[in-house]
């Protein structure tokens, strides 16, 4: 499920909110995705210490270009009005990417290239 501004579910790190998209009786692993959680990674580690984290990194300019090619402001869902324009979106991408890189460095995570997309790097942090 996707969480964040303009998404069906807000990017709030509250168990009730995080459980909303899922069947309450299910024991399956839940996958929660949000660009905004890049700014809350330390909180996720502290509050949900049994949760794994997978970081996806793509350079700022490439991220913006991909987002525009995927439809940018011209798609109906999610609603990206919050980001106002391309310049503002680029600023948000840069802030989120910076947060991802700082978290990976702080936790000494290893980056691996995506198997198909050479410009995407992946790092994983799982509980010990």
Annotate each PLM feature.
Residues 28-35:
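Conserved two-lobed SF2 helicase motor
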Residues 35-113, 117-127:
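PAPS-dependent sulfotransferase catalytic domain
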Residues 1-28, 128:
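PAPS-dependent sulfotransferase catalytic core
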């Amino acid at each position: 499920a996707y969480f964040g501004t303009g998404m069906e579910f807000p990017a709030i790190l509250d168990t009730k909110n995080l459980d909303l998209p899922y069947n309450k009786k299910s024991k399956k692993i839940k996958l929660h995705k949000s660009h905004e959680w890049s700014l809350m990674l330390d909180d996720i580690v502290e509050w949900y210490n049994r949760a794994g984290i997978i970081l996806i990194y793509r350079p700022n300019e490439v991220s913006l270009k991909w987002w525009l090619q995927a439809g940018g402001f011209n798609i109906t869902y999610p609603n990206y009005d919050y980001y106002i324009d391309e310049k503002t979106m680029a600023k948000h991408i840069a802030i989120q990417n910076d947060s991802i890189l700082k978290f990976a460095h702080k936790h000494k995570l290893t980056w691996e290239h995506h198997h198909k997309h050479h410009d995407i790097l992946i790092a994983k942090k799982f509980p010990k």
